[in-house]
Every structure is written in C-alpha cells, then in structure tokens.
Amino acid sequence: MEAWLGSLLFLATMVIASKAVCSIENREIFPNQMSDDCMDADGNKHFLNTPWKKNCTWCSCDKTSITCCTNATRPLSYDKDNCDVQFHPENCTYSVVDRKNPGKTCRVDSWTM
C-alpha cells in the first residue's frame, strides 16, 4: 500500500507541477530480476519507488507498474517546408528555426505534449 501511495504521489506531483503527459505500463518481472527492482526499456535496473530521468522523461516504478511522465511540449503547427525542429535536451525544450537561416526562428501556431 505504501508503494502504491508513493507512486501515486509521484504521478500527481508530475502532472500538477508540469502539466505533464504520463504513461503507465505493467511491470514485467524477469527470471533473474530481484523483487525490489524494476527494469526500464533499455534494460537498466532501478529500485522500487525511486524516480529516474532519461531523455526528459521522469519515471518511477512500484510492485506492479512503471509510470513515466514528460513535460516537453513539441511544435505541432509550423511551416514544415521551410523550418526545422531542434530539440534541446539540456532543458527539455524544442525550437523551430528557418532551414536556410538557423539563426532565425519560425512562427509556431500550436504546441502539443
């Protein structure tokens, strides 16, 4: 019960603080896996109820699931013929720049999570 409440608190904090988009997946348990850890999509082990971050996505796991949230908004409506999207992993943001002149930003009409 404590683990479930911890994961719920983590999820609620991420959603409220950042208006994040989250996904919840069932936790797979493998034969050589200890019961007090979980494995991410890259095969890395993490302790239960301990958050980790990779590629601007924050994750945590409990005994039954892995919850991951991201708050990086992506450009949706922009001039796709003349502009390129650049991702900035250091601050989890995107910018849209002119393809011929990358120093010039392009107008973005809408963003999505």
From Swiss-Prot:
- What are the alphabetically sorted keywords of the record? Disulfide bond, Secreted, Signal
Chief location category: secreted
Kindly indicate where the leader peptide sits in this chain. 1-20
InterPro entries attached to this UniProt entry: PSP94
Family membership: Belongs to the beta-microseminoprotein family.
Q: What is the lineage of its organism?
A: Eukaryota, Metazoa, Chordata, Craniata, Vertebrata
Entry GO CC: extracellular region
Quaternary data: Homodimer; Interacts with PI16.
- One Pfam family linked to the record: PSP94
- Name of the protein in question: Beta-microseminoprotein
- Give each disulfide bond as a residue pair: 22-69, 38-61, 56-92, 59-68, 83-106
Native organism is Mus musculus
What subcellular locations does the record give? Answer: Secreted
